[in-house]
Design a protein with these regions (language model features):
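Metabolite-binding pocket within alpha/beta catalytic cores that recognizes anionic/polar moieties
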Residues: 2-149
Length: 149
């Protein structure tokens, strides 16, 4: 039996958009760039050859378009792990829940998420303002303790 998400668990706006992000499932690409500041979204999207949507809802801004022939979404998360949790949870819902039936879709849709922006560092040899590329990240905030799996 498929899991059903009650209206209190999955908030969908009357226009079919997910509650916090204001994005509809068809407006989400499989490749998503996450930035903190909403002002960075148009900066990243300026590299798109075309844009299909530009959505500003609360502190979240989302632009989906095409970059070098590939469909991509760039979205702001705001500041902090709480906001990032909301974004990632709602991105998964957009990709993997049928909004009409409120059930998990039969085929899993994998999203590729790339974080682009500023970060703290715990290594003494990394200076403020230095550019780094990470393969992984580790949160010391305890958020993962709230998830099963």
């Amino acid at each position: 039996m498929k899991r059903y998400f009650a209206p209190s668990e999955l908030l969908i706006e009357p226009n079919g958009a997910i509650y916090h992000l204001g994005v509809k499932p068809e407006q989400l690409a499989d490749k998503v760039i996450l930035v903190g500041d909403p002002g960075r979204v148009p900066l990243v999207a300026s590299h798109f050859s075309e844009q299909e949507c530009d959505i500003q809802h609360r502190e979240f801004r989302t632009i989906t378009g095409t970059y070098k022939g590939k469909r991509m979404t760039v979205m702001s998360t705001g500041i902090g792990i709480g906001n990032i949790d909301i974004c990632v949870t709602e991105l998964d819902a957009l990709a993997n829940i049928d909004f009409a039936t409120r059930q998990v879709k039969p085929e899993f849709r994998k999203l590729t998420l790339v974080r682009l922006g500023t970060s703290g560092a715990i290594q003494e040899d990394i200076e403020v303002g230095e550019t780094i590329f990470s393969r992984t990240s580790l949160g010391f905030d305890g958020l993962l303790n709230y998830y099963k799996g």
